[in-house]
Amino acid sequence: MDERILEFIKNEQLLSWAMIDEKGVYTASAFYAFDEKNLAFIIASHEDTKHIRLASENSSIALNIAKESKIAFLKGVQAKAEFKMASKEQMKIYFSKFPFAKFDKSAKIYALELFWLKFTNNALGLSKKLEFYKK
């Protein structure tokens, strides 16, 4: 993955993600840590939430991270990923970034494993996009 994309991802911590429900698309937001080795966003949530139930039923999800409202400075990521339970190593990554999350014993840790990503950075030029495909 291009270093400029990784730098953007590592400097942010909030994403929006979408999954399918019975009427179409459903969205949620989550704080994340990033697993560089496995190229996965790591999030925490509760099993009984609608977004976790939906992602468990259909693991193909989309996500978005956007920063800056001025068009000339817009930076952001659009991505497709697979929803999974986090590994023990990913749990360590998440808790090292958000140690207070350990206190919520009912929350589970999940991974959104990337398979496609598009990075927009208008500071590079309005038509310049960087894409990543997992091999």
UniProtKB/Swiss-Prot annotation:
Organism: Campylobacter jejuni subsp. jejuni serotype O:2 (strain ATCC 700819 / NCTC 11168)
InterPro entries documented for this protein: Split_barrel_FMN-bd, UPF0306
Family the entry assigns: Belongs to the UPF0306 family.
Organism lineage string: Bacteria, Pseudomonadati, Campylobacterota, Epsilonproteobacteria, Campylobacterales
Entry protein name: UPF0306 protein Cj1449c
Top-level division of the source organism's lineage: Bacteria
